[in-house]
Amino acid sequence: MTDMRNEEWLINKYNELRKTDARGYCFVSLKIKRFRIFNRLYGREMGDLLINKVYEVLDEWLDHDECIAHIHLNYYNLIMHYQDDYDEFFRRMIAMNRVIRDMPFEAFHGQIFSGMGIFPLPAEPVDFRTAQYNADICRAECPQSVFRNSHFEIYGVT
């Protein structure tokens, strides 16, 4: 696996952000959908390559003050800008999904889908685990997750 930033790195980055003004950012929980099936069909080597490629394409796509960390297997956390203009934010999330789905690697092009939970960071800062938990709950409890190739949902504090 390539040198991917991990959860410990993201915790430090998140805590730095909390010291300033975290408003205008969101915490994103992202999982590659049907990863276990992909891994069984194509083997662990291709599964590892997929994990790396998703990380690479998102890391290149994100703005310079946004970040991604590989947590484990097919699970990533991101810190991204969050606009008050929902239409603009939705377009950005759709574009992010497109970056994953249409990555310029023939073996995966058009076949990789994701589920995302988005937790807008509140004015009153929450700790890393609370932000992660809220984004995870949002992703896991999204009513569209079983009906869509890719999905995302936005929740506030639970």
Give, region by region, the residue ranges found by the protein language model.
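Conserved long alpha-helical elements within nucleotide-processing catalytic cores of c-di-GMP signaling
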Residues: 2-26, 33-59, 69-73, 87-90, ...
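Catalytic-core segments of nucleotide cyclases and related cyclic-nucleotide turnover enzymes
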Residues: 7, 11, 15, 86-97, ...
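Conserved hydrophobic/aromatic beta-strand scaffold that supports enzyme active sites
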Residues: 27-29, 118
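Short, conserved catalytic or interaction motifs in soluble domains
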Residues: 40, 81, 144
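Short catalytic/binding micro-motifs of nucleotide second-messenger systems
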Residues: 60-65, 96-109, 141-143
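A short glycine-enriched loop-to-beta-strand structural element that forms part of the catalytic core
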Residues: 70-81, 106-139, 148-156
